């Protein structure tokens, strides 16, 4: 907080891939805000849908037997889009979705007569929000520090199937509730999975009877070229968390896609297990209207598949930066997500280098995000190769100034 005191960049308006600050300067939004503005800024279709919903019903509780027609419609739509037979639990964002999935996993095993299955496994570099369970699952050490004792979790190396199997065996499968995995690690540095990794992980979970949770908060709704991102690996998770791109950030909404077999215990006759959990604003009517309109745009405008169509162009455009001695690696190639990692020598000798690159790019009218050991790029799905070129040029100039 102190680091940005009196130094805020005030973003005043947006249109497509562009945003403007309060001084009128235009910037290329090369991060889709915070990984979420998939359809681009200023879409009138979403604004109109939300306005119409506000005129009819702004919101009403979804607790107990209450529901709104628009929430029903969204849940039905999401269930139809899911890669497995499923039910939908709506939340207000990604962090709530992670907490919800974690609680469902633990409550599911309790309902199955296995209450000791509470341990959760995640990966180094993984990001799962900053709520209670998400903080405990964090594979980014800085996100866990300073908060005292947390929920018991185990982090394993992000690229090792052997480490996952060993962690389950070491803890005892009878104690492990679920493994949480981003299809592509996002905030931890943009690490696409090794070939066969996701498929192998699902097999390990099946053999061990452990639930597999795909955290698709960043990867969904076109970012990897499909509705939930994980479909491109040909697997059926036990749960999928989503948020961000489901509304393109126009209003806050998230949720969990829960496979039928995981949801089943909670749909028994009265007297069966109860999942006592739910955010106040879950299934908010106006937010649901935004999501429905956004999903329609993704399909109508051909944006859903853009993440996969553009992944090669984005990576190829940025890859020449790797020839700069100040760059260790350019990662990407799976969806419209990429990272330019700075060299260890540079970071050791110049700890402020990442911030300097971010600010130099900003001076050139390009917004990138510093994270991990470099900067990330994740533009709206309406971006083009020309926009990728602007990102490359801004980063090249920024690197030349170090």
Predicted stretch roles:
Residues 1-402:
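Conserved N-terminal phosphate-binding loop of PLP-dependent enzymes in the Aspartate aminotransferase
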């Amino acid at each position: 907080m102190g680091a940005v005191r009196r130094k805020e960049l005030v973003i005043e308006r947006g249109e497509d891939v562009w945003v403007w600050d309060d001084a009128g300067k235009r910037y290329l939004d090369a991060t889709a805000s915070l990984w979420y503005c998939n359809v681009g800024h200023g879409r009138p279709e979403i604004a109109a849908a939300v306005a119409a919903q506000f005129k009819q019903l702004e919101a009403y509780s979804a607790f107990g037997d209450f529901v709104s027609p628009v929430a029903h419609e969204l849940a039905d739509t999401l269930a139809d889009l899911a890669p497995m037979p499923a039910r939908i639990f709506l939340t207000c964002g990604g962090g709530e979705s992670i907490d919800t999935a974690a609680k469902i996993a633990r409550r599911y095993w309790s309902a199955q007569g296995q209450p000791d299955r509470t341990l959760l496994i995640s990966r180094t570099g993984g990001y799962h929000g900053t709520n209670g369970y998400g903080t405990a699952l964090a594979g980014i050490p800085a996100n866990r520090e300073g908060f005292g004792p947390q929920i018991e979790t185990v982090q394993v190396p992000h690229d090792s199937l052997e480490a996952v199997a060993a962690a389950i065996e070491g803890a005892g499968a009878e104690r492990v509730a679920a493994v949480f995995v981003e299809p592509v690690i996002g905030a931890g540095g943009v690490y696409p999975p090794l070939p066969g990794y996701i498929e192998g992980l699902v097999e390990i979970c099946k053999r061990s009877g452990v639930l597999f949770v795909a955290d698709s908060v960043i990867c969904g709704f076109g970012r990897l070229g499909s509705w939930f991102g994980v479909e491109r690996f040909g697997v059926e998770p036990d749960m999928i968390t989503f948020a961000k791109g489901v509304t393109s950030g126009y209003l806050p909404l998230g949720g969990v896609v829960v496979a039928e077999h995981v949801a089943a215990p909670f749909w028994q006759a009265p007297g069966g297990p109860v999942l006592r959990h739910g955010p106040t604003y879950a299934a908010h009517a106006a937010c649901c209207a935004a999501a429905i309109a956004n999903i329609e745009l993704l399909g109508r405008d051909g944006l859903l598949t853009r993440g996969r169509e553009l992944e090669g162009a984005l990576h190829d455009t940025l890859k020449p930066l790797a020839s700069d001695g100040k760059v260790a690696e350019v990662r990407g190639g799976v969806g419209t997500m990429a990272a330019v990692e700075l060299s260890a020598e540079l970071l050791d000798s110049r700890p402020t280098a990442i911030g300097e690159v971010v600010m130099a790019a900003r001076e050139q009218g390009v917004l990138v995000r510093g994270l991990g050991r470099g900067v990330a790029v994740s533009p709206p799905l309406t971006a083009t190769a020309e926009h990728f070129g602007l990102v490359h040029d801004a980063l090249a100039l920024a690197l030349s100034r170090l």
